[in-house]
Design a protein with these regions (language model features):
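Amide-donor transfer/coupling interface in amidating biosynthetic enzymes
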Residues: 1-130
Length: 130
């Protein structure tokens, strides 16, 4: 990340910018996420509220939210308390989903996270079409 860029689309959260302790800026833990109705992700999870585990330092800068949505990227998962973007998708693409959390943290061999299951299914279908 270039700290001198004039367009900080991805950046540290404002309250984290003055923290200098190594690891002190990491967003850790399980957080609620409200999913947009009828989004691909809400259909994958089968609900409009999820809770997922995080471990990251940087966030999407909401100052760019409108501009991104006007150009096809939809922010379909938002933390209800902080209003941070948790999930994006591009509906016109076959399977284009980005998340701030780690779906692998809530996965086991016998019970994988729904996003992982859906991604693998989409990859199989794509491979069969090639």
């Amino acid at each position: 990340i270039d700290p001198t860029t004039s367009h900080k689309v991805i950046d540290l959260m404002d309250e984290q910018k003055s923290v200098s302790t190594l690891g002190g800026t990491t967003r850790l833990g399980s957080f609620d996420c409200t999913l947009r109705a009828n989004s691909k992700v809400s259909k994958i999870y089968g609900t409009q509220t999820i809770k997922e585990r995080h471990r990251h330092r940087f966030e999407f800068n909401n100052e760019y939210l409108e501009q991104f949505e006007q150009n096809g990227m939809q922010c379909v998962g938002i933390n209800p308390d902080s209003k941070l973007v948790e999930i994006i998708e591009m509906p016109e693409k076959r399977w284009y989903i980005g998340v701030q959390f780690h779906p692998e943290y809530s996965s086991t061999v016998l019970s994988p996270n729904p996003l992982i299951v859906d991604f693998v299914k989409a990859a199989i279908v794509y491979g069969e079409e090639k």
